[in-house]
Swiss-Prot record:
Organism: Nicotiana tabacum (Common tobacco)
Keywords (A to Z) from UniProt: Chloroplast, Copper, Electron transport, Membrane, Metal-binding, Plastid, Thylakoid, Transport
One Gene Ontology term of the molecular function aspect: copper ion binding
PROSITE patterns: COPPER_BLUE (PS00196)
Intracellular or extracellular location(s): Plastid, Chloroplast thylakoid membrane
Protein name: Plastocyanin A'/A''
Entry membrane topology: Peripheral membrane protein
Pfam families per UniProt: Copper-bind
Protein family per UniProt: Belongs to the plastocyanin family.
Length: 99
């Protein structure tokens, strides 16, 4: 599945913002905006036992331009919450359920 960082109208959002994947399915986050975004998984809102450092970008790491991507594959079933560090306060938060 491809998830856009930034809506087509310039909104600070993940598109889609709430989605499901199968365990082992690749998720590709793609910057859809002219400014930096990233994908940080919330260590308190992922399944127990998952190492957040293995799935998350760091808060200081960015996809700086349109078309830049970050991919991750989640193998543990459950719900994962993620956010864009610079825009979390503006509501740029998403959720993925792994089945």
């Amino acid at each position: 599945i491809e998830v856009l960082l930034g809506s087509d109208d310039g909104g600070l959002a993940f598109v889609p913002g709430n989605f499901s994947v199968s365990a082992g399915e690749k998720i590709t986050f793609k910057n859809n905006a002219g400014f930096p975004h990233n994908v940080v998984f919330d260590e308190d809102e992922i399944p127990a036992g998952v190492d957040v450092s293995k799935i998350s970008m760091s808060e200081e790491e960015y996809l700086n331009g349109p078309g830049e991507t970050y991919s991750v594959t989640l193998s543990e079933k459950g719900t994962y919450t993620f956010y864009c560090a610079p825009h979390q306060g503006a509501g740029m938060v998403g959720k993925v359920t792994v089945n």
